[in-house]
Amino acid sequence: MSGRDVIFVVGMSRSGTSALARVFSLCGGAIPLELLPPNFANPAGYWEPRHAVEINDAFLEAQASSWHDARLTLQLRPTFGPLQERFMTEIVEILARGFQPDGPIVVKEPRITALLPYWTAAAVELRLRPVFVHIFRNPADVAASLFARDGLSVEHSFALWLKYNLIGERDTRGLRRIFVSYEEVMHDWEPVVARCAAEVGIEVGIDDAIRSAVGDFLSPALHHHRASAIDETAVDPLMVAWVARVYAVLRRASEHRIRMSALDQILCDYVDSGRADASFLAPTA
């Protein structure tokens, strides 16, 4: 296993993480041996390890959190003790034994974006070579999708979008990484995969059979829940402004112009405002 690439698909839920993970697997990546099954919200499949969802959920729940906890408490004030040590052991087991034996390992599970230090450390412990592909999507489209699937308010969805994208960027600095947009993948996936290969060394193979398979998978039906379906007028104007600024930075990042200082300032302003720990952002039953 030493020296094998592990591709972490980083990003917010409903941002194309499933689609991108499947594209990488069709291009030669190793998928989980036990997949989370598809359902009404993702009929084309999630392409994520079922056990990863289970251990991530349990780890978050043990700390009064969840995937839809938009607060930044665990990310800004991390602790390490028996709970975290056990979690690391479980991650190592999944990465070591939970994937097909050949090709770069493709790890997609949106909760991982909020827990990247643990998953990165586990990969390094196994002497895997982590690489991070950060996919982002128009935040209004994400909010529309989360409302349709989970009934989340626009403001809650925007706060989640901020959390996952700001933390996902912060926790991959200095590591092999690349930023891509959902729209790029859906419009023309092949240049995106080629760019990942060229810029961060992901080993992929593309031939006519793969082009056909990916083309069949990336149907227009996957691109649903557009921004026109939501109303931003009731959202805190500061939240709207922060989301817009982060989205602009990420779009430039996909063109190789990442402004980390701008993202640092937004995160600082967001935390200082008190909104990052607001009670309405906490998980609900």
PLM features per residue range, with description:
Residues 55-60, 151-160, 227-234:
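A polyampholytic, Gly/Pro-enriched intrinsically disordered region
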Residues 53-60, 88-96, 140, 144, ...:
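Generic detector of well-ordered alpha-helical segments enriched in charged/polar residues
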Residues 1-2, 198-285:
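PAPS-dependent sulfotransferases, especially Golgi type II membrane carbohydrate sulfotransferases
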Residues 36-37, 135, 207-210:
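Proline- and acidic/polar-enriched loop/turn elements at helix boundaries
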Residues 88-206:
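PAPS-dependent sulfotransferase catalytic domain
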Residues 17, 45-49, 84, 88, ...:
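A structural signal for well-ordered alpha-helical scaffolds and beta->alpha junctions
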Residues 56-71, 127, 151, 186, ...:
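Glycine-centered secondary-structure boundary/capping sites
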Residues 1-88, 214, 220:
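PAPS-dependent sulfotransferase catalytic core
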